[in-house]
Amino acid sequence: MSYIIDRRLNAKNKSAVNRQRFLRRYRDQIREAVSDAVSNRSIRDIDKGGKVSIPAKDINEPVIHHGDGGFNNRVLPGNKHFSEGDKITRPQGGGAGSGGKQASDSGEGEDDFSFTLSQEEFLDFMFDGLELPNLVKRQLSGIEEFKKVRAGIANEGQPGKINIVRSLRSANMRRIALTAGKRRRLDEVESELSELEAQPESSRDRLRYTALQEEAARLYTAINRIPWLDTFDLKYNLHIKQPIPRSKAVMFCIMDVSGSMDQATKDVAKRFFILLYLFLQRNYEKTDIVFIRHHTSAKEVDEDEFFHSRETGGTVVSSALKLMNAIIEERYSPEEWNIYGAQASDGDNWGDDSDSCRDLIVDKLLPSCQYFSYIEITPNEHQSLWRTYEEVRASYPDKFSLQHIIGVEDIYPVFRELFQKKVA
């Protein structure tokens, strides 16, 4: 009897390769299922893995079966209806090879295929194909991160980095340099010996002939004494550590918490900013996030207060934009930082403040920002702030974006639209 001992390193997850192949093959269907799951989850569970379902028809493999046409000769037991040589009509629908998997008034149908995604896999699909737009400013920061690059050839190094071609070339040049004079003299001696050997033996100068033979032997010995490869010849590939320029980015999350924002609207805004927060934390290690809440006045808050504070009031949107500009001037130089802004509001604003918002964005923020997005959350018609911002989008389509969210189901599609990776 044969025994098979499985010593694979991933013994607890032996089908990992097959699983990854499955996830790659049905990436589009899984991404759509993840999108549905994000829309239906609570805020607390939005970043967790779990069960997702894709239509079974999307994972069916192609099969080869008999077609409806053609003729076959078979020997079948006879009966009172058929005699020898009769042709039997092929039954209709018998070649599809499917007997149906559930009761249906239409005669066909299949259950969805359900499986579980880990948290890591779920987040991979959630943020697949997304990036911060225009992330171009790179600086050598104080972070100790390097990459190894080739820096030519060195005379010393590790045995594993020896450059064989350069070493042999160096050895060959050394041997040529050290033996050039001896080889030249050896050619002269051999030429003279050839002349003497061409003479009749009776008239040959024997003393001279013997002396030349002895000199040729000494030259051969001296040339062969030169080592074929010396430690001096060894050359090594040199690699040095080169500091990696880092992209320094900051995202300003601006949320309207005024009295016109009811609890449902605030929950939609929070879900959007949670998605943005997870996206930045997962994809960009060195990204600052500044949280700003505003009603009639604005203030910078921490993560916990941003998502859980119940403070409310009137609506003056420009207060948040002024605070954002002040923070940029104080802490984030546009020469070094990639600056982004995301603003969520129901669009309601006080009096003529919308014009002030437009002037602040055009004159102060957009010259410093790489990208600014405004998300209006309302099931009704657009408010004055949206109409004012449309003028800004018309003038700066690459740096300013507008999106409209009606309900929870629109959050994830809008998020992907804002941060979809641009094709070069």
Curated annotation (Swiss-Prot):
It comes from the Bacteria. Residues 61-112 are annotated as: Disordered. Pfam families: DUF444. Belongs to the UPF0229 family. NCBIfam families: PRK05325.1-2, PRK05325.1-3. This is UPF0229 protein CJA_2563. It comes from Cellvibrio japonicus (strain Ueda107) (Pseudomonas fluorescens subsp. cellulosa).
